[in-house]
UniProtKB/Swiss-Prot annotation:
GO terms for molecular function: actin binding; actin filament binding; ATP binding; ATP hydrolysis activity; microfilament motor activity. GO terms for cellular component: actin cytoskeleton; cytoplasm; membrane; mitochondrial outer membrane; mitochondrion; myosin complex. It comes from Xenopus laevis (African clawed frog). It holds the Pfam family Myosin_head. The gene is myo19. Keywords: Actin-binding, ATP-binding, Cytoplasm, Cytoskeleton, Membrane, Mitochondrion, Mitochondrion outer membrane, Motor protein, Myosin, Nucleotide-binding, Repeat. This is Unconventional myosin-XIX. GO terms for biological process: actin filament organization; regulation of cytokinesis; regulation of mitochondrial fission.
Length: 971
C-alpha cells in the first residue's frame, strides 16, 4: 500500500547552475520509498495471519500472491478464498496435517468455518449439509488444478476423512461400516496403479478422470461407493513421451515380483522392455504388495490376480516385437529374428497360437459384401500400429473390467443409501511441447469445469443479485464461453469437424484439416495457429493459457479403429479372463463397428457424452471447490515461484472469486423454504402459520408480501438490533424480491436459534405427552379398579347366594335329621331309663357324696382312662351322645353330672369290651368318646369350640349299623 507524501517531503529540489540537484531528488525519492517499504514490510509480516483472502485489502492479484507466499513460507498451505479453498502443494510430508486426530477435531467443532482453513473444512461443511437436509442435499467436491498440484492426494485425504467421521457407536454397525470403508479406501491404490503414471509434471499423475460417489444412509454412514471413470489415456501403454513412464502397475510388477512369479510371468530381472522406460527411477508408488492386498480385499482372488499379471506381462513382451520391411508388397512383414522369442512368450502368456498372432498383426482382412473376403499384407508401420492397437485394446478392456469389479464390491443397494457426496478428480490443465487429441479432451474437460465454476459462483451470483434488487457493483470476470463454443459449439466447432472427417472415412492429410479449421472457425477469437511451425497445428486460447495442438493423426485417433481380426484373435484365446473381456457375442457388433462403410462412436463424441452426464450431476448437487496450486514446475519442496503461481491464479479466476465472495452472500433460500424451515424461531404472539395454504387462496403477489412479513418477523427474532422498520440490509442478510441472501455466519445463527427452539418445543411436547400419558394411565387404572370391583362384587354376591342356598339346604336337612334323632332318642330313653337308674343309684349310695367330691378334687390333671364294654343295648352310647342328652347333662348341676359319668363308666366297665378315654381339666365334661385301638394323645389346650379336640377316627368295636352312623354324625 502506498501513502501520500507529507508536506515536509514536498520541497522544491535545489538547482545548481540551472539544473536540478539529482542527488537531492534521489534522496527525496528514497525517503518516500523507504516509508512505503516500511509500511509494506509491516503488512507483509502480518500477511500470513490472513486466513481468508477476502480480508486482504485491496484485493488485487499482487496482494493475493504475496499473502499466499507469506503463508507458504510460514508452513501454512491452505487459505480460504471466499467460497473456495486454495491448497498450495508443499511437495513434502507435513507432520500431523492429515492425521485422524485432526480429522476428528474438524468434525467435532461447533463452527467449522471458524477453524483454520483446511480441506477438512470443506469436507465437514459438505457432510453437515447432508445432515441438515437442505436442498439440494447431495454434495460435490470438485478438486481442480494443474497436473502435479495435488488433486489425487487431496481426494485420497477426503475419502479418509469421511471414512473416519462416519464411524458408528454401535459395535456391530461400526464393524460393518469399517469393512465398507476399508473396501472404498482400497479402491484408491488399485485405481492409481492401473490409471496413474509418472509424467514430466507429476510423479503420480492421473491419466484418467474419476468421480467417486460416497453413498450415505440416513445416519450419514458410508454404506458403499461407486466410481465413474472418464477417458483413460490408453495410448500410454504403447507410447511414452521422453522422460515419462508407463502406468505404475508395469513397474510394480517388474520390481516387486517374487522369483516364482517372475518365472511364471516370464519377467527376468535384467530384461529390457521398450514399453517400460525409465524403470531405474524408484518412486513411492512402486509398491506391488499394497496393490495386491488391495485387490484381494476388493474380491479379486489370487488366481485372478495371477491371470491379470500374466496378461500385462504378455503386453510387455508384445511391445518388443519388431517387424522388418517386406521386400515384396505381396508378402507380409516378418518379425525380426531377435524378436521371435518375444512373440512366442507373448502368445504363450495370452494363450493364443503364435502363428495366429503374427498373421493377424501383419495381414489385414478386407470384407467386400457379405461373403467376399480379401487379405492384404500390411506395411511395417501398419504392423506396428496393429500391435499397439492390440495392446491398447486389451489394457482398456482390462481397466474397464477392474472398475466394474470394484463397483460390484463397494457399491451398495439403492435401498441402503439415501444421499451421496461426490469427489471429482480429473486431469489438470495440460500443455506440452507436443499436444494431440488426448490433451485437447483433457483441456476441454477443464474448460467445462471452469465454466461450471464461473456460472455457479460468478455469473449466476451477479445475475441473481441484480434480479433480486441487491445493491451490487458488478465485477468483470473471465468468461470462457467463447472457448467452449469453439470446442463443442453447434453447428460448427473443432469437435464437429473432426467427427465429420471420421464419418466421411476419406484420406485427408493434416494440412487440409488445418485449412478447414481456419476457414470454418475464423470468426472465433480463441483459435489461431503458429505460422512459423512446419507441422500442421492450431492454437486454442484456453482460460489457463494458449496451447498448440498437432493435427497429425488427430482424426485417426478420434476414430479409434480396432481391426475385427484382432478382436477375433482375442476371442479365440484360451485365457478365461480374456474370454470375459472379449465375449464371442460381441462379434457381430464388432463387425458392424469396424466395417469400412460405417464408423462407430468417436472418441470425442463418447467423451463429450460422459462429460455432459457428469455436468448434470454437478448441477444437481451443492458444489464445493478446492483449487490446488502448484508452486513450482520442478516439484521442489517449499519453493514458491511467483510467476508460475500467478498464471494459475489468473487462470482459475481466484481474484474474481474473492471480489464477489468478499461482498456477496453465498447462501440463497427462497421465501417459502425459509419460512418453512425457520418458522419455529418466530415468537408465539406472531401466530405464524405455514405458507402452503396460500397457494390456492391468494395470488402470488399477496402471498409474497405475507411471506416477506413472516420472514422479517423471523429475522427480527434472531437479529433484533440490526432489524429496524422491516429494513434488512446489512452484512449478514439481505432480502430480495423472492429470495433471502445469507452469509455463513447468519445461517449458523439461524440454525442455532432453530435448534434451541426445536429443543424447547420438543421438551414442551415431551412434558405434554408425559402428563397426558400419566392421566391416561390414571384413568385406565381407575377404570380397571372399577371393573375389578364390579366383577369381584358380582362374584362375591354369586358365591354368597350359592352359599346361602347350600346353607338353607343343609339347614333344612339337618333340622329334619335332628328332629328324627331326637324322636328316636326319646323313644329309646323311655325304654331303658328304669334299669340304668336302679343300678346307678345303688352304687352311688354305697359311698357318700363327699368321697365323690374328694375323688373329684384329687383327680390329676391328666387323662384318666377306664375300659368298658357296652352290653346293655345298641343305643346305650347313642343315648349319651345324642344332642338332647348332651344338653341335658351339661345343664344339670355338678352332682348330677358326676352321677351320670360314674353311671356310664360303671356300665362300660362291667361289660369290659370298650375303652373310654376321659379328659378332664376342670369341673365339667371336656370329652368322652370311644377311640380306636392304640395310644392317642390328647392336649389340654382349651378351644372355644365344643368338642374341638375329639379325634374323628373309626371305632373298631362292636358298634355297627345305625349306631355307628349316629356316632360319626355326632362327632
Amino acid at each position: 500500500m502506498s501513502r501520500p507524501l507529507s508536506k515536509n517531503t514536498e520541497r522544491e529540489p535545489k538547482q545548481i547552475n540551472g539544473h536540478q540537484n539529482n542527488l537531492s531528488n534521489h534522496k527525496h525519492l528514497s525517503k518516500s520509498l523507504e516509508q512505503e517499504m516500511k509500511a509494506f514490510l509491516i503488512d507483509e509480516k502480518e500477511l500470513h495471519l490472513y486466513d481468508d483472502l477476502t480480508k486482504v485489502n485491496p484485493v488485487t492479484t499482487a496482494t493475493v500472491l504475496k499473502c499466499l507466499q507469506a503463508r507458504y513460507s510460514a508452513g501454512v498451505f491452505y487459505t480460504n478464498a471466499g467460497c473456495t479453498v486454495v491448497a498450495v502443494n508443499p511437495f513434502q510430508p507435513v507432520y500431523k496435517l492429515y492425521s485422524s486426530e485432526v480429522m476428528k477435531d474438524y468434525h467435532s467443532t461447533s463452527n467449522p468455518q471458524g477453524c483454520k482453513p483446511h480441506i477438512f473444512t470443506v469436507a465437514e461443511q459438505a457432510y453437515r449439509n447432508v445432515q441438515s437436509q437442505i436442498q439440494p442435499v447431495n454434495q460435490s467436491i470438485i478438486v481442480s488444478g494443474e497436473s502435479g498440484a495435488g488433486k489425487t492426494w487431496t481426494s485420497r485425504c477426503l475419502m479418509k476423512f469421511y471414512a473416519t467421521v462416519s464411524a458408528s457407536r454401535c459395535y456391530i454397525t461400526n464393524e460393518m461400516v469399517e469393512r465398507i470403508e476399508g473396501r472404498v479406501l482400497d479402491s484408491n491404490p488399485v485405481m492409481e496403479a492401473f490409471g496413474n503414471a509418472c509424467t514430466l509434471r507429476n510423479n503420480n499423475s492421473s491419466r484418467f478422470g474419476k468421480y467417486i460417489q460416497l453413498q450415505l444412509n440416513r445416519a450419514q454412514q458410508i454404506t458403499g461407493a461407486s466410481i465413474q471413470t472418464y477417458l483413460l489415456e490408453k495410448t500410454r501403454v504403447a507410447h511414452q513421451a521422453p522422460l515419462e513412464r508407463n502406468f505404475h502397475i508395469f513397474y510394480q510388477m517388474f520390481k516387486g515380483a517374487s522369483r516364482l512369479e517372475r518365472e511364471e510371468w516370464n519377467l527376468p530381472e535384467k530384461a529390457n522392455f521398450s514399453w517400460l522406460p525409465n524403470y531405474e527411477n524408484n518412486l513411492e508408488e512402486d509398491d506391488f504388495e499394497v496393490t495386491k492386498k488391495a485387490m484381494l480385499h476388493l474380491g479379486i482372488d489370487q488366481p485372478t490376480q495371477n491371470n491379470i499379471f500374466k496378461i500385462l506381462s504378455g503386453l510387455l513382451h508384445l511391445g518388443n516385437i519388431k517387424f522388418s520391411d517386406s521386400v515384396d508388397e505381396s508378402q507380409p512383414c516378418e518379425p525380426l529374428n531377435y524378436t521371435q522369442e518375444f512373440a512366442s512368450i507373448a502368445a504363450n502368456l495370452l494363450k493364443i497360437p503364435v502363428s495366429h498372432l503374427l498373421e493377424r498383426l501383419s495381414i489385414r482382412t478386407i470384407t467386400a459384401g457379405k461373403q467376399q473376403v480379401f487379405k492384404k499384407p500390411c506395411r511395417k508401420s501398419e504392423c506396428d500400429t496393429r500391435r499397439d492397437c492390440l495392446a491398447k485394446t486389451i489394457y482398456a478392456r482390462l481397466f474397464e473390467w477392474l472398475v466394474t469389479v470394484i463397483n460390484e464390491n463397494i457399491c451398495a443397494e439403492s435401498c441402503r443409501w439415501n444421499n451421496f457426496i461426490g469427489l471429482l478428480d480429473v486431469y489438470g490443465f495440460e500443455s506440452f511441447p507436443e499436444n494431440n487429441l488426448e490433451q485437447l479432451c483433457i483441456n476441454y474437460a477443464n474448460e467445462k469445469l471452469q465454466q461450471h465454476f464461473v456460472s455457479h459462483y460468478l455469473k449466476s451470483q451477479q445475475d441473481e443479485y441484480a434480479a433480486e434488487g441487491l445493491e451490487w457493483s458488478f465485477i468483470s470476470y473471465q468468461d470462457n464461453q467463447s472457448c467452449v463454443d469453439l470446442l463443442e459449439g453447434s453447428p460448427i466447432s473443432i469437435f464437429s469437424l473432426l467427427n465429420e472427417e471420421c464419418r466421411l472415412n476419406r484420406s485427408l492429410d493434416a494440412g487440409q484439416l488445418q485449412s478447414r479449421l481456419e476457414n470454418a472457425l475464423s470468426h472465433n477469437k480463441c483459435i489461431g495457429r503458429d505460422k512459423f511451425s512446419k507441422k500442421p497445428n492450431f492454437i486454442v486460447s484456453h482460460y489457463a493459457g494458449k496451447v498448440q495442438y498437432q493435427i497429425e493423426d488427430m482424426a485417426e485417433k478420434n476414430k479409434d479403429p480396432v481391426p475385427p481380426e484382432l478382436i477375433q484373435l482375442l476371442q479365440e484365446s484360451d485365457d478365461h479372463l480374456l474370454q470375459k473381456l472379449f465375449p464371442v457375442d460381441n462379434n457381430k457388433l464388432v463387425y458392424g463397428a469396424t466395417n469400412n462403410r460405417a464408423v462407430g462412436v468417436t472418441v470425442v463424441s463418447k467423451f463429450k457424452g460422459s462429460l455432459e452426464s457428469l455436468m448434470q450431476i454437478l448441477h444437481s448437487t451443492t458444489p464445493h471447490y478446492i483449487r490446488c496450486i502448484k508452486p513450482n514446475v520442478d516439484c521442489q519442496a517449499l519453493v514458491f515461484r511467483q510467476e508460475e503461481v500467478l498464471m494459475q491464479l489468473e487462470a482459475c479466476g481466484i481474484v474474481e472469486t474473492i471480489n464477489i465472495s468478499a461482498a456477496g452472500f453465498p447462501i440463497r433460500i427462497s421465501f417459502e423454504n425459509f419460512v418453512e424451515r425457520y418458522s419455529v424461531i418466530a415468537p408465539r404472539q406472531s401466530h405464524m402459520k405455514t405458507c402452503f395454504p396460500l397457494k390456492k387462496k391468494q395470488g402470488s403477489i399477496e402471498k409474497t408480501d405475507q411471506l416477506s412479513s413472516k420472514l422479517h418477523t423471523i429475522l427480527q427474532a434472531v437479529l433484533p438490533k440490526q432489524c429496524k422498520d422491516s429494513t434488512l440490509s446489512n452484512s449478514l442478510v439481505h432480502c430480495g424480491t423472492t429470495k433471502v441472501f445469507l452469509t455463513h455466519l447468519m445461517v449458523e445463527l439461524l440454525e442455532e436459534r432453530r435448534l434451541i427452539a426445536i429443543s424447547s418445543k420438543a421438551m414442551c411436547i415431551q412434558c405434554c405427552w408425559r402428563s397426558y400419558r400419566q392421566r391416561k394411565l390414571a384413568k385406565q387404572s381407575k377404570a380397571a379398579t372399577t371393573i375389578q370391583a364390579a366383577v369381584k362384587g358380582w362374584l362375591t354376591k354369586k358365591y354368597i347366594k350359592r352359599m346361602h342356598s347350600a346353607a338353607t339346604v343343609i339347614k333344612r336337612i339337618w333340622k329334619k335329621w335332628k328332629e328324627k334323632m331326637e324322636a328316636l332318642a326319646a323313644a329309646e330313653l323311655d325304654d331303658s331309663t328304669e334299669d340304668v337308674e336302679s343300678t346307678l343309684f345303688s352304687s352311688m349310695l354305697a359311698s357318700p357324696v363327699k368321697s365323690l367330691e374328694s375323688s373329684k378334687t384329687n383327680l390329676p390333671d391328666k387323662i384318666m382312662t377306664q375300659s368298658a364294654i357296652l352290653r346293655f343295648g345298641t343305643l346305650g352310647l347313642v343315648l349319651y351322645g345324642a344332642p338332647a342328652i348332651r344338653k341335658y347333662i351339661v345343664e344339670t348341676d355338678e352332682l348330677k353330672r358326676n352321677q351320670n359319668i360314674l353311671m356310664c363308666l360303671n356300665m362300660l366297665h362291667r361289660n369290659n369290651r370298650y375303652k373310654v378315654t376321659v379328659n378332664r381339666e376342670e369341673p365339667g365334661i371336656t370329652s368322652i368318646r370311644a377311640r380306636p385301638q392304640g395310644s392317642i394323645r390328647f392336649h389340654y389346650k382349651r378351644s372355644p369350640l365344643h368338642f374341638a379336640n375329639i379325634c374323628p377316627g373309626k371305632i373298631n368295636c362292636g358298634i355297627t349299623g345305625f349306631n355307628e352312623i349316629l356316632l360319626e354324625k355326632t362327632v
